[in-house]
């Protein structure tokens, strides 16, 4: 497995998902493709941060008020290899944490992410199509401060704040249908893939890659 050394300020190792053991590759599908509900192919993340324990997840912050642990709450619907440590999160989860930090500042209170409301692997039982949760760029927020987001009024209120603070964020429409929401605020950054500078990458070969033009 190819990794880079964790820095003094950020303890999680960067991992090339394509070089992980087969059991992890089969559930993370690094660099693979999922198809969204419009029939568009979306390329999955290739690079991940490795989380070796719950203690490390709780002690490592991606933003001043958001620890890694808040993005990896799962239940038995997650694929078995990702129910135990080590766990892997897409690098773009750090971008989501920064967006949530801005949202938290705007609402002036705590923001709570639900179980299975952060990163979910492509093999999670409830993953349907190309969910941004598989990119680590979506969060399901069930509570802000002392307010539970279990009504159209509260969800709409905080969705409007999210869109005002983060103009490019997407919030799920309200309603009882499966593709809508009525008991939490879903916000996501889309299909963002983050490749840190220290990622090894590959030498580009036009003959092998094909001329895109």
Predicted regions and their residues:
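N-terminal start-of-chain detector that recognizes signal peptides
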Residues: 85-88, 110-116, 156-163
């Amino acid at each position: 497995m190819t990794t880079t050394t964790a820095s003094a300020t950020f303890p999680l190792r960067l991992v090339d998902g394509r070089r992980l053991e087969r059991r992890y590759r089969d559930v993370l599908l690094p660099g693979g493709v999922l198809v969204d509900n419009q029939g568009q192919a979306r390329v999955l993340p290739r690079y991940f941060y490795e989380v070796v324990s719950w203690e490390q997840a709780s002690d490592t912050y991606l933003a001043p008020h958001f620890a890694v642990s808040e993005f990896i709450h799962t239940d038995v619907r997650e694929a078995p290899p990702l129910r135990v440590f080590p766990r892997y999160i897409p690098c773009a989860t750090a971008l989501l944490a920064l967006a949530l930090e801005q949202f938290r500042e705007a609402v002036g209170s705590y923001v709570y992410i639900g179980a299975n409301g952060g990163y979910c692997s492509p093999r999670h039982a409830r993953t349907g199509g190309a969910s941004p949760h598989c990119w680590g760029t979506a969060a399901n927020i069930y509570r802000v401060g002392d307010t539970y987001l279990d009504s159209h009024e509260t969800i709409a209120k905080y969705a409007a704040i999210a869109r005002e603070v983060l103009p490019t964020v997407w919030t799920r429409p309200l309603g009882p249908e499966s593709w809508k929401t009525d008991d939490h605020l879903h916000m996501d950054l889309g299909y963002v893939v983050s490749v840190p500078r220290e990622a090894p990458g590959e030498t580009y070969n036009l003959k092998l890659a094909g001329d895109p033009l």
